[in-house]
C-alpha cells in the first residue's frame, strides 16, 4: 500500500512538473509597437473638426456575462461561459446595445477568439460582420497557455483583445505592450497592451483613438503606475504635436467618486498626473467600475 501511495505521489509531482514546464515554455510576450492590420469599411465618412461625435467603450466580458452570472475572480462561482449558445446570445445583446447607441467610434475590450472560456467563438469577426460600416483594428491583449486554474473548472487557453471600430477613415493602427509583473502572476495577467488607431480629420490633423484594458488583479502599485505612465506619455506626445486624442477602455480605476480600499483592484484614477492638454470625461451618475461577485440587480448592485 505504501509503495502504491508513493508511486501515485511521484506521478502527481511528475505531472505537476511537466505542466509547470509547459506553462513556462509556452509563455512569450508579443513585441512592443506592433503594426496592426486594418479592416476597411464599405464606406468611410469624413471626420470634421467642428462637429460632435459619439464614442462608446464597452468591456463585453468575452460574451460570458448574462445578468445572473458571477465571476470567480470577484468572489463569484463561474469561470467560463455557460455554453456556445449563451455566448452568441450575449454577443447579440451587446450588438443590440451598440446599434441602439449608433456611435461613430467604438472601443471593445475582452473580445475573444479561439478561447476555451468562450467556446472558441470568433468575436472580432462577429462584430466586424455585423458592422460593415465601421473600419476596425484588433490588438491582442491576452494570450496564454492552457491555464489549469481553477482546478474544478479550468479557464483553459485564452486569446482575447481590444477591438476598435471607426466610421471615419482609419489609416493605421499600432499595439503597444504595457508593463506587467515579472513574477508568477505574469501567467495570469497575460499580455496587457493598448492600441492606437489613427483616423483622418478634414483639417489635416489626425485623431488618435486609444483602446486600453489595464491590469486588475495585481497588488504591485509600481506596475499599475507604470502602465498609466506609458499610456499618458504616448497620448501627450500626440496632443503636443497638435493632434486630437481620446482614450476609452477598462481602466480598473475609479474615474469619478471614491475607491473602496477593501477592493485591492480598485484604485482612484491619477487625474493629477495628466498633462494640461488631457482631461477625464466620465459620467458621475453611472459608476462603471463594478464587482461581479453577485448576480446583477437594478437596485442592488
Where are these regions (language model features)?
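N-terminal, active-site-proximal structural segment of metallo-dependent hydrolase catalytic domains
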Residues: 2-130, 138-153
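Short, P/G- and charge-enriched loop/turn segments at secondary-structure junctions
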Residues: 43-44, 149-154, 181-186, 294-295
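Beta-strand-turn-beta hairpins that frame and shape the catalytic cleft
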Residues: 45-55, 64-67, 158, 162-172, ...
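Active-site beta-strand/loop signature of hydrolases that rely on acidic residues for catalysis
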Residues: 54-60, 90-120, 165, 197-199, ...
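Surface-exposed cleft-lining segments at the edges of enzyme active sites
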Residues: 77-83, 111-114, 178-186, 213-222, ...
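Conserved beta strand-loop-helix elements of the APE1-like EEP
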Residues: 128-132, 157-173, 297-301
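Conserved S-adenosyl-L-methionine
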Residues: 135-144, 173-179
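Metal-dependent phosphoesterases centered on the DNase I-like endonuclease/exonuclease/phosphatase
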Residues: 218-301
